[in-house]
Swiss-Prot record:
The lineage of its organism: Eukaryota, Amoebozoa, Evosea, Eumycetozoa, Dictyostelia. It comes from the Eukaryota. GO terms for cellular component: extracellular region. It is found in: Secreted. It comes from Dictyostelium discoideum (Social amoeba). Keywords: Glycoprotein, Secreted, Signal. Residues 1-38 have a biased composition (Low complexity). This is Putative uncharacterized protein DDB_G0285441/DDB_G0288841. Residues 1-21 form the signal peptide. The keyword Secreted applies. Glycans are attached at N34. Residues 1-42 are annotated as: Disordered.
Length: 71
């Protein structure tokens, strides 16, 4: 349920809010607790360019032709 609403939010533009809410809820264990926002944007938005103001964000890999790249 949450994934679907976040997917629609991604296309509408509520990218940061959906990412942070999801990332804290489902993948907070995968990423460091202090770097959740930075890593969350990097990993969750692998299809989108990394936000430049985030110094911890490494260069994102090229987007795959698969629409469900976060799976």
């Amino acid at each position: 349920m949450t994934l679907f609403s976040s997917l629609s939010s991604l296309s509408t533009g509520s990218l940061k809010s959906s990412v942070s809410s999801i990332e804290t809820g489902s993948s907070s264990g995968s990423f460091g607790s202090n770097e959740t926002s930075g890593w969350g944007h990097h990993h969750w938005n692998s299809c989108h360019p990394c936000p430049p103001p985030r110094p911890i964000c490494r260069p994102c890999p090229p987007c795959r032709p698969v629409p469900r790249c976060h799976h």
